[in-house]
Amino acid sequence: MADAETFAFQAEINQLLSLIINTFYSNKEIFLRELISNSSDALDKIRFESLTDKSKLDGQPELFIHIIPDKTNNTLTIIDSGIGMTKADLVNNLGTIARSGTKEFMEALAAGADVSMIGQFGVGFYSAYLVADKVVVTTKHNDDEQYVWESQAGGSFTVTRDTSGETLGRGTKMVLYLKEDQLEYLEERRLKDLVKKHSEFISYPISLWIEKTIEKEISDDEEEEEKKDEEGKVEEVDEEKEKEEKKKKKIKEVSHEWDLVNKQKPIWMRKPEEINKEEYAAFYKSLSNDWEEHLAVKHFSVEGQLEFKAILFVPKRAPFDLFDTKKKPNNIKLYVRRVFIMDNCEDIIPEYLGFVKGIVDSEDLPLNISRETLQQNKILKVIRKNLVKKCLELFFEIAENKEDYNKFYEAFSKNLKLGIHEDSQNRTKIAELLRYHSTKSGDELTSLKDYVTRMKEGQNDIFYITGESKKAVENSPFLEKLKKKGIEVLYMVDAIDEYAIGQLKEFEGKKLVSATKEGLKLDETEDEKKKKEELKEKFEGLCKVIKDVLGDKVEKVIVSDRVVDSPCCLVTGEYGWTANMERIMKAQALRDSSMAGYMSSKKTMEINPENSIMDELRKRADADKNDKSVKDLVLLLFETALLTSGFSLDEPNTFGSRIHRMLKLGLSIDDDDAVEADAEMPPLEDDADAEGSKMEEVD
């Protein structure tokens, strides 16, 4: 053999290997599923390449997976005639470059996840070390020579050019040197059971090298023939007599042969009524590398001008990289007339349905279709439209069971909201699937449909409030009047709600109205209208004083009928960002700051004329417009309103200082420290006693 090159495992991979080797896992059997799955992927790749270039299969025309148990040497060998690996592939993929999932998988394990999740994180190969203490990989790619990779997982591995003369033609051979306590994986029955359990629906023949013992009946003279020939004796006996006396004897003859294990035809070609739950679960697990069963399944065929069959699965959990934009979606496998074409076709299903797993087998697409021509293909557009329709049907079926739908919604509500934002064609349909907490729903979630059925007489709009969390919005000043009138308000506390609601303007003819934006119209009696006009007139002077103090911090100051208990609140323009949206946009590292200029709309301060603080402030302002304490109190009220209305403070230190000085006044503490006069925050008057009584008013 040529000289071996030694490489160190990348740190994270080394950590993962030591975790796999040194931790006890009860379900080590999943290693076989992972290795067969890798072989299947390698076969998919070469088959796809061969569609446009037949010569790619010259090295080995047959596509297969072979499993060879060797009880003499305690090894288990898995051979596939897939695409193989070049030397660079061997070095990179099996050791020196950590996949994005390596770290996540270790974190998941530490959090108590099952080792059988390994395939979902793209590191399934290393599961071989669950049962083996040494692994040797021999591989041949069409573009390179044959190489051997070897490691006992002790921090390093070697790669050598294979000069043994035993050529693969093309593909990969993995030899697992099994640990002493893992020899059960050499038993024919155990291996067959595992293939049937995990890999029954792999679309390539999986054959097991089995030992067959046949009992053969032979006569004594057949057995002794050779002996007689050697001795050279010839006896002449009566033929009839010889036949009678001839004794029969049984001997065991041992032979080896390939036994095809996965004999099932593709599950999607069978009728749904013929397939039981267990078969769907087994197919889902082999398709997705998930260790859990699916939450729901949709098996259907479309016939007519266009023909295709499909099976779609909804998982129980969201994958760790659900919204990883760098990762290409590969959850829908595309087949053409039972031939696998690709599993990362971005156009087959919209991004918001990226969590749905499954297969599509088309009768109409050309076999040699490429990713480029696929994008313009009209057939694919029709398939996509049908898949979206069937996915939504499936979600409505899940919604019939409240418990299942709660699980589904917890995992995939963001996807539905992304669908509202992106899919204008199905927006109203998806809106029916949305669920929210509300002022009347308690711990339960409510649908928009249910909200509409509970609307008060004369109520024409659906009211909602956006914010950081349910806790942050449930006592918001914006809800005071609505609650008093018994009007239900939906809590939209997911960041993506802001984007979704920007697109979903109405539901069943009812306009969606934000409780935090100006222009909130509620039904009023004649008496209420009259009283409002009187208060407006009474507080006109204070509104002007507040506007003068705050300057361009607010666009206008008006008397509010929105707040009942709080002294004031800050509302945004009808078409600008809400406070919550402003918070979200500020948090985005790559935000477009020019956009913030015109989207973060001017704030309107709405004051509550029936609040005692505001009434006292009005009296002081009317008595003396230049009262310095009025300015300080207005600034303090503005800053607290910023917080209670969901905005962030631009100058938290100034706010802190203002509060501390108010506390000192309230506690009658003299502030001897020289304080510089601040135009924004003038010092309070020296009369501590008088201010103390004022402070009681503020409290």
Curated annotation (Swiss-Prot):
List of residues that carry Phosphoserine: S219
Motif TPR repeat-binding, chain ranges: 695-699
GO biological process: chaperone-mediated protein folding; defense response to bacterium; innate immune response
Consequence recorded when altering A11T: In hsp90.2-7; No effect on ATPase activity, dimerization and interaction with RAR1. Decreased interaction with SGT1B
MF (Gene Ontology): ATP binding; ATP hydrolysis activity; ATP-dependent protein folding chaperone; unfolded protein binding
Domain of life: Eukaryota
Any single GO CC term annotated in Swiss-Prot or TrEMBL for this entry: cytoplasm
Phenotypic consequence of R337C: In hsp90.2-6; Decreased dimerization. Loss of ATPase activity and interaction with RAR1 and SGT1B
Residues annotated as binding ATP: 34, 38, 80, 85, 93, 99-101, 120-125, 172, 371
SUPFAM superfamilies, per the entry: ATPase domain of HSP90 chaperone/DNA topoisomerase II/histidine kinase (SSF55874), HSP90 C-terminal domain (SSF110942), Ribosomal protein S5 domain 2-like (SSF54211)
ATP-binding in keyword set: yes
Pfam families: HATPase_c_3, HSP90
Places the protein is found: Cytoplasm
SMART domains (alphabetical): HATPase_c (SM00387)
Family: Belongs to the heat shock protein 90 family.
Subunit comment: Homodimer. Interacts with RPM1, RAR1 and SGT1B. Interacts with OEP61, OEP64 and OM64. Interacts with HSFA1D.
Domain-level remarks: The TPR repeat-binding motif mediates interaction with TPR repeat-containing proteins.
Protein name, per record: Heat shock protein 90-2
Species the sequence originates in: Arabidopsis thaliana
Lineage of the organism: Eukaryota, Viridiplantae, Streptophyta, Embryophyta, Tracheophyta
